Amino acid sequence: DEEPKETCSDDMCVIYCKGEEFSTGACDGPQKCKCS
C-alpha cells in the first residue's frame, strides 16, 4: 500500500485532505493524492 503523494497527474487518483478522502471544495490542510 503506497503512501499518498504530494502531486499526481492521473485523473483516477483520489485526493486526500488531512488524511480523509476529498473530492470537492477547498482544502485548508495538507493535500495529497493516492493512486490505486
Curated annotation (Swiss-Prot):
Main localization of the protein described in the UniProt heading: secreted
The entry's keywords: Disulfide bond, Ion channel impairing toxin, Neurotoxin, Potassium channel impairing toxin, Secreted, Toxin, Voltage-gated potassium channel impairing toxin
Tissues expressing the protein: Expressed by the venom gland.
Position of the signal peptide: none
GO MF annotation terms: potassium channel inhibitor activity; toxin activity
Protein localization: Secreted
GO cellular component: extracellular region
Pfam families xref list: Toxin_31
Cysteine pairings via disulfide bonds: 8-27, 13-33, 17-35
Gene Ontology terms describing biological process: envenomation resulting in negative regulation of voltage-gated potassium channel activity in another organism
Domain notes: Has the structural arrangement of an alpha-helix connected to antiparallel beta-sheets by disulfide bonds (CS-alpha/beta).
Cited function: Binds and inhibits voltage-sensitive potassium channels. Inhibits the vertebrate potassium channel Kv1.1/KCNA1 with low affinity.
UniProt record similarity statement: Belongs to the short scorpion toxin superfamily. Potassium channel inhibitor family. Alpha-KTx 11 subfamily.
Protein name as annotated: Potassium channel toxin alpha-KTx 11.3
